[in-house]
Amino acid sequence: MKRRKRGRGIVNADRISQLPEALIIQILSLLPTEVAVTTSVLSKQWQFLWKMLPKLNFDSLDQRHEFKTFSKNVKRALLSHKAPVLHSLHLIVHLHLCNSMNTAKLIGIAFACNLRKLVLEVDGGRFSIPESLYNCETLDTLELKYSILMDVPSSICLKSLRTLHLHYVDFKDNESALNLLSGCPNLENLVVHRYPFSSVKTYTIAVSSLKRLTIYTSSTVDPRAGYVINSPSLTYLKIVGQIGFCLIENVPELVEASMIVSSQIINKNLLESLTSVKRLFLEFSPLMIKFPAGSIFYQLVYLELLTHEAECLNLLTLMLNSSPKLQILKLLSPKYQSWKKDVVGKWNKPKIVPECLLFHLETFMWKGYEWKRNDETEVAKYILSNTNRLKRATFFSKPISSEERVKMVKNLNSVVRALNSCQLLIK
């Protein structure tokens, strides 16, 4: 019996070692890098497997009780790496545990490993990006976060870079910001979380290869700060937060746009520059922006509109009149309305039934529908009574009694056109 148990134990011990090396490496890559390194003591076969890991992750706080050992351990791991390509390196550096000089050296060593993706998070001081980064030929993805200052030379050349994320990163000056983007000739995806106290007031994004652009700004950003966007290949645009101005030029390929803006827009062309899109999400006060006269959203088939102010319903009228091919309409009301029920003014319904209602609208959804508000009821009934192709209308309201629900359904059903066989849902 004992021999059987011992034999069974030997079999169990050998099971992992009998797996293909590629699978073992894949398993090790799911572990924290420091844990994966310690597996080298398990057997001779495992002694070198960790050196083939495609991804390495290090956090200096994990070694905060071993002062000055972090940079040595990371350096040793990078110099021991044997795979032809290091697919990803994620460094979380606290400068009181690993100073700027050592951090710069680690980045330089990583580039010698044919690094494809670098994620660098810095805290505890201001870190200046080393010049070696600005001429890395293998880097495909770069994510820089927090206490980082970029002094970008005009000689920058990141020819392989396709994805760039900048989280609260600051630039030495306007020229550095321009140099960074001009030195990325194949950049396709850019995400910017703007540093609130940046020295760059006008952020110019002129990249001919750029396809996706996402911008986040906080309420503490200078209200005079803004953006100039000139990217002819852009297909997706999202802007969130407070901006002083936004000039969008030459974006003929734009397909989807999301504008969640909480401050006044100085320029007048914001919506006019979005007329080529097929999908559009709008969240801002209509009183803060001028609707482009005569502009038609010929390609628009999907529209989401946040109705957080009474005036938003009049923006809806303008959008319906200007979107002849609209197929899907979603209205989103905040959970708790900040404006009074008896608001001054009323909804200005279209003078002529919009073309999209007559020929194209198939799906209508309203989240946060206030069925007791006269203006919202008027909007809902107008859309239901004037659509010929509507297949489904869904209304999400706050919790109401069974009697109120029956009353609301009856009220809406009374105007649904029989010829469009619309499915009316109340949730």
From Swiss-Prot:
Keyword Repeat part of the UniProt annotation: yes
UniProt KW keywords: Leucine-rich repeat, Repeat
SUPFAM superfamilies: F-box domain, L domain-like
Segments forming domain FBD: 346-396
Coiled-coil stretches: none
Placement of LRR repeats on the sequence: 67-93, 98-122, 141-168, 169-194, 213-241, 258-284
Top-rank taxon, per record: Eukaryota
F-box domain location: 13-61
Pfam families the record matches: F-box, FBD, LRR_2
Official protein name in the record: Putative F-box/FBD/LRR-repeat protein At4g13965
